[in-house]
Amino acid sequence: MYVGIDVGTSMVKAAAFDDEGRQLAVAARPVGLALHGGVVEQDMEEVYSAVLAVLGELASRAPGPVALAGLTGQGDGVWLVDGDGRPVRAAASWMDGRAHELVDRWLADGTFETVFRRTGSAMFPGCPGPLLAWLDSHEPKALDAARAAVYCKDMVFQRLTGRSRPTTDVSDASMPFLDPRTRAYDNRVVELLGLTHRRGLLAPVSDPVATAEAREGLPAGTRLANGPYDLPSCALGAGVTSPGDGLLIVGTCLAGLVATTDLDLTGEPAGLYISTDRPGYWLRAMPAMVGTAALDWVLTTTGVAHEEVDALLAETPPGAHGVRVLPYFAPSGERAPFVEPRLRAELTGVSLESTKADLIRATCEGIGFAARHCLKAAGLTGTLAVCGGGTRSPAWMRLLADVLGRPLRVIEGEVGARGAVLAAAARYGVALDTTTWTEPTTVVEPDPSRAAYYAKEFEDHLERLAQARKRARRD
């Protein structure tokens, strides 16, 4: 039996798989987010307790020897820990917006673009560079007390294994300090962000991913591998490894990723290049800030349950009777496929005749257009896999296939945890049939007439977005 652990933003999960990649059992626990005035934080002890809880539940539901385990989790943010991996302060989430003024300044003075040209990382307020700079100005004592600024999975790995020092991997380190060519930190970028005196906080990069034996949570001595983080782990779990092939993650965030061997640091600075376990191979990532969270907000506001979405999507035609949604709901603006810290969502075309069904369809269409924009910018030329919570809605998957104008290889289940196991197996030299492990649950084909309609609507979406970005810059 193999165990994958996925420490997500709102949910912590552990899944068990057999030798053929069949999912045997899943355990999950929600974790909270504290939101106030653009600040988004998480309690590290709550997160770690949730990890122990799901591992305990999984052991009772799928008893048996564990051959090995893989660990993945949310990326970005700043998780300040002491030498034992325990929190110095609450974790600043990747959704945090407190450092938006720093990003605005770096956009204006050229620092933002310089960093992208060096590392392929388009910074956003919730990534480590701006957050560390903000903390250095406003909470220097917290940085003084910390041994390292790590990422979510790194904190969990250190606690589960009892390792004496924190480390990270090349995937998490990719934003914004890692040089994707040398796979080492770029000290010039550290200097540009005013963090040279905090350089020692950057966790050492373990390349390939770190391994150790578990001391708690898993049976003692279980082999455990740390990484990659959730985006590349999902790509592994969906079988996206050939250049040109892509993955769309329809989760809390909306992420488009395309495998590539071409490191192109020209063009509009946006997204990032995620370094993988294979030097010379990257994932061109366009991780938008908000995916299913946008739909969740609309459902909560309208009093509609998730179970009603499929029926409501059938009640109104493509175009939602003229209702349109620009789905940029994050308090920190947008980070891909462009960076606009002050951009906010827009709802237009609403009248007294508009229905809940119109609002729901318009939101799903808007998210679909944002996904198309991300995948186009990432350079998708091959097949497209889709995973994440959004795949639980067959009607939304059909709508997405139409909006994107291409077949969708839908991968259900715990794809991130699956990818973490595959990464661990590769690290330990355990032979698993990756083709069998990554077979799609189903393939959804687009309707030609609706796909043609949405191709035209996508151009309208881009025009409305351009106007919204202009307004955001004036505010």
Give the location of each predicted region:
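Short loop/turn motifs at secondary-structure junctions
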Residues: 65, 198-201, 380
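A generic structural motif
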Residues: 29-30, 94, 196
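Short alpha-helix plus adjacent loop in nuclease-associated cores
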Residues: 92, 96-109, 422
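Active-site core segments that coordinate phosphate-bearing ligands/cofactors
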Residues: 3-4, 107-119, 130-165, 176-192, ...
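Short beta-strand-loop/turn "lid" adjacent to the catalytic site in phosphate-handling enzymes
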Residues: 60-94, 122-126, 157-179, 204-210
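N-terminal glycine/serine-rich phosphate-binding loop of ATP-dependent small-molecule kinases
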Residues: 1-90, 117, 217-226, 401-408, ...
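A conserved helix-loop-beta module that forms one wall/lid of the active-site cleft
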Residues: 194-208
